[in-house]
């Protein structure tokens, strides 16, 4: 596999993942705005973590599939930088409980998501 081909595979997957991320933000925007908590970011991080756990075994032997789905799609879908920025904004706005809750929920639920994805893959695949 050539490096240029790998770039295109990852880029195509990243495009798909980024569009999926944007759609989740649009769908969950009203809840996030209404309650002042970044629900969309939490949702994509937990779902992305589950999917990484679920798909890691099936794509481990397929280098093209792994690059497209694991690196591209899920890399473009999950949002650690957005999570970090939103946490800092909450903290800077004096919302210390929401900032702490955001860190706790993202870390805990994403770990649970990966674990559940692994377990679901064992059962389903």
UniProtKB/Swiss-Prot annotation:
InterPro entries: FluC (IPR003691). The chain crosses the membrane at residues 7-27, 36-56, 63-83, 96-116. Na(+) binds at residues 75, 78. Its main location: membrane. It comes from the Bacteria. Keywords: Cell inner membrane, Cell membrane, Ion channel, Ion transport, Membrane, Metal-binding, Sodium, Transmembrane, Transmembrane helix, Transport. Coiled coil: none annotated. Na(+) is not transported, but it plays an essential structural role and its presence is essential for fluoride channel function. GO terms for biological process: cellular detoxification of fluoride. It catalyses: fluoride(in) = fluoride(out). It is found in: Cell inner membrane. GO terms for cellular component: plasma membrane. It is a multi-pass membrane protein. GO terms for molecular function: fluoride channel activity; metal ion binding. Belongs to the fluoride channel Fluc/FEX (TC 1.A.43) family. NCBIfam families: crcB (TIGR00494). HAMAP family: FluC. This is Fluoride-specific ion channel FluC. It comes from Elusimicrobium minutum (strain Pei191).
